[in-house]
Amino acid sequence: MTAASLLLLPTWAGAYRPFVSTDAAVANPKELEVELGYFNLERTRRENTFTTPSLVLNYGLFKNWEAVGEFRVEASPAFEITDPGLFLKAVLKEGLLQGKPGVSVAIEAGPLLPSTLPGEHGVGFEVIGIVSGRVSPFTVHANTGGGIDRADARPFWIWGVIGELPVARNLRLVGELNGGSMQGELPNNSALLGFIWQPTSSNVFLDARVRRGISRAAPDWQFTIGVTFGFSLASSSNRAVPW
């Protein structure tokens, strides 16, 4: 499989940094949450790809609903706008991530917009179901979904599981297994290890991770660092945190 064909596999909507998958939580009403990946290095069969930046914007529309917009800028070697999309995310059942008992359940869906890459000028669609809960001492987020890709309207299926382990007051070790497959393509599966650190009491989180491909269609290695921050456009508020 060539590096170009790897790009046809979809990148998930509204991912929760530094993961490919996401959690069953949304921004509070009138709160803007910014997920910025300011450096990403991907190595596939001795070819390096730099992505800087990647940007996800989450805006709380009203209680338990948010709008999500995202895109990436890729240099390999030309500059391209990749993986643009607009999505709606809704919490169907309040639970751990909303400060209530039980699991949190959410759904996210929306169009995959055209990119500047060759062959990706169409419009696709993606929908994901999300469940978040606790398997002590871990917080776990499970995702599954699918859709139609933007390149040639082929169906795809995606899945992922995130685990988070608090090791200090403002530090979490994190891991993820995730994958995806598209009709006529090999599975793209990978594993992640990293950390999320909150350096102050403000709503700012720094992250770093390394990802290793565990199937032939996945990139060999990926390294990234990024930051997530949020602020209210009305009054200050914070997302419930389960630790």
Across the structure, where does each feature detected by a protein language model lie?
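Bacterial N-terminal signal peptides that target proteins for export
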Residues: 1-2
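Short stretches within intrinsically disordered, low-complexity N-terminal or propeptide regions
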Residues: 5-6, 92
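N-terminal signal peptide c-region/cleavage motif recognized by signal peptidases
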Residues: 8-10
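Transmembrane beta-barrel domains of Gram-negative outer membranes and organellar outer membranes
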Residues: 13-243
